[in-house]
């Protein structure tokens, strides 16, 4: 997360979204939620001390982490099934679901796209985008989603 040569904020958000949706405990290093900076070269310089002045925080990143944390607090996620589906070489989906609720996290490292996912056996009476910019709707047992370049999107579905 501190490698400026490979860091891409939008792709990073997708990786964090996947982490929050996968089973197990999400793990953040202090300050990640507010976009704290660091410098490369040594472990000591990899992270600056925590910045407590909110005017220096990346509020968009904080809003993103809050949305992921809120989704993660759903009690049903503790016993939900999961599935990972490859969309193509630049996108994949993490699905968490029970008989009554589901989250679909679509992680896009590529260009603007439209995706059709098989949602057989997932609850799909209602669909809401929890985080991200795009459109999502169900048609039969398919979830059709369109979203922008490098945009990752979290969708909630329920009966």
Predicted regions span which residues?
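Conserved alpha/beta catalytic core and glycan-binding cleft of carbohydrate-active enzymes
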Residues: 1-41, 96-98, 105-115, 131
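Solvent-exposed beta-hairpin/edge-strand motifs
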Residues: 120-133
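Carbohydrate-binding surface patches
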Residues: 85-122, 153
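C-terminal beta-strand-rich structural cap/linker in extracellular carbohydrate-active enzymes
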Residues: 139-159
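Short, exposed beta-strand/loop patches in secreted or surface proteins that constitute
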Residues: 82-85, 95, 134-139
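Hydrophobic, well-ordered secondary-structure elements that form the walls
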Residues: 19, 31, 68, 104-108, ...
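Aromatic- and carboxylate-lined catalytic core of secreted/periplasmic carbohydrate-active enzymes
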Residues: 48-87
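Active-site His/acidic residue clusters
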Residues: 41-47
């Amino acid at each position: 997360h501190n490698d400026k040569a490979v860091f891409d904020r939008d792709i990073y958000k997708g990786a964090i979204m996947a982490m929050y949706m996968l089973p197990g405990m999400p793990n953040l290093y202090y300050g990640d939620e507010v976009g704290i900076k660091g410098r490369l070269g040594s472990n000591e310089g990899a992270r600056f001390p925590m910045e407590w002045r909110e005017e220096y925080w990346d509020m968009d990143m904080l809003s993103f982490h809050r949305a992921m944390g809120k989704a993660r607090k759903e009690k049903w996620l503790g016993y939900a099934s999961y599935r990972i589906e490859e969309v193509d070489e630049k996108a994949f989906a993490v699905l968490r679901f029970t008989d009554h609720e589901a989250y679909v996290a679509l992680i896009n490292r590529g260009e603007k796209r439209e995706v059709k996912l098989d949602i057989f056996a997932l609850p799909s009476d209602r669909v809401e985008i929890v985080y991200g910019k795009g459109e999502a709707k169900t048609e039969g047992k398919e979830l059709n989603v369109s979203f922008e370049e490098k945009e990752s999107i979290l969708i909630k579905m329920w009966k």
